[in-house]
A protein has these predicted regions:
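Short, charge-rich amphipathic interface segments used for partner binding and complex assembly
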Residues: 6-52
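A ubiquitous short alpha-helical element
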Residues: 1-5
Length: 52
């Protein structure tokens, strides 16, 4: 996966989590936050590989 895709996924998941929280869909919000976290981890792994 490329960096641009992962950054877009982070933004989308964070935005959806915010909507879920406003609608009191806490379980869905948590799942979207987990997805955002996963994408962020992949971004940082890409950066580490580039710096090696």
């Amino acid at each position: 996966m490329n960096r641009e895709y992962l950054e877009a996924k982070v933004d989308l998941c964070l935005n959806q989590a915010e909507i879920d929280i406003q609608q009191e869909e806490i379980a869905r919000a948590i799942k979207n936050l987990e997805r955002a976290n996963s994408a962020l981890s992949r971004i940082f792994n890409l950066e580490e590989e580039e710096n090696e």
